[in-house]
Every structure is written in C-alpha cells, then in structure tokens.
C-alpha cells in the first residue's frame, strides 16, 4: 500500500470532488500552445496517457474541435486505487480558425503525449506581389 504524507490530503480530496472529471456534455479544457512557423500555424495540446484512438478532431466551417478521453488504467473491476491524482474523463478545446487558413490541409500527429496540429495558411492569403504597368499596360498579380 502507498502512504501519502501530504498534510493537505483532505483539501486534495475535496478539490477532486468539486472538479469532477470531464464528461462528453461537460468536458474539461486541455492545455495548449500555438505559434506560427513560416506559413504554418502549429497548435500543440497536452494529452498524456490518452490513446490516439480516443482523440477526435473535427473542423466545421472555421471551428476546430479537439476532444479526447482518458479512462482509468487497467481493468477497473480488479483494481483498487490507492492514489488517483491524474485527471480522467473527457477533455475538449475549440478554436476559431481564420478564413485565411487552409482547413483542407490540416495535419495531426500524436507523440509522447502531445497532439500537434499543423494548419497551413491558404494560398489565397499568402503575400503576393502586384506588378505595376505603365500607360496601357495592365496590373498583374503573381504568386
């Protein structure tokens, strides 16, 4: 048996009861980072211990939704938890994507408990040079 020597054990128990695990109707938020690398936005979500098959990524119009579920380890009917500090349940995060992003080309990778999405900037939104002509010449946009 594992012994806890934390003097705030009762506070921990009360906090866990008040912040119950997320459910599909009321999921818990997951931590994330977002940055831009050249012409791609990179969004990383911390999902340690989540089976990749339990991760759902949906894009509807410009709304990106990530949902994941982490259940208890092992066979629950034969396991008696002594210490349960890792969060369980459903985790979710929604992001509103700009119209300038190419939602058809989103890539998702899951490695070492981190889900990484790569969202490229749409070609139509990339910087272009406008050629200026003189007199009867016309202006032409080039990529």
UniProtKB/Swiss-Prot annotation:
- Identify the CDD domains for this entry: ACD_sHsps-like
- Highest taxon, organism lineage: Bacteria
Query: What keywords does the record list, in alphabetical order?
Result: Stress response
According to the entry, every stretch annotated as the sHSP domain falls at 23-135
Q: Which InterPro entries match?
A: A-crystallin/Hsp20_dom, HSP20-like_chaperone, Small_HSP
Outline the inducing conditions: By heat shock.
What the entry lists under PROSITE patterns is as follows: SHSP
User: Ion transport as a keyword?
Assistant: no
- The coiled-coil regions, if any, are none
Family note: Belongs to the small heat shock protein (HSP20) family.
Please give the name of this protein.
18 kDa heat shock protein
Q: Which organism is it from?
A: Streptomyces albus G
Give the classification, highest ranks: Bacteria, Bacillati, Actinomycetota, Actinomycetes, Kitasatosporales
């Amino acid at each position: 048996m594992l012994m806890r020597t934390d003097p705030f054990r009762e506070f921990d128990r009360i906090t866990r009861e008040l912040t119950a695990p997320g459910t599909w109707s009321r999921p818990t938020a997951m931590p994330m980072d977002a940055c831009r690398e050249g012409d791609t936005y990179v969004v990383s979500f911390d999902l340690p211990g989540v089976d990749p098959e339990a991760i759902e990524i949906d894009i509807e119009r410009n709304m990106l939704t990530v949902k994941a579920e982490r259940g208890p380890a092992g066979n629950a009917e034969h396991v008696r938890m002594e210490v349960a500090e890792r969060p369980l349940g459903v985790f979710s995060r929604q992001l509103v994507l700009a119209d300038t992003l190419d939602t058809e080309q989103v890539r998702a990778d899951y490695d070492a408990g981190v889900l990484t999405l790569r969202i490229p900037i749409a070609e139509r939104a990339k910087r272009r040079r406008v050629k200026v002509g003189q007199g009867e010449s016309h202006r032409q946009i080039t990529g």
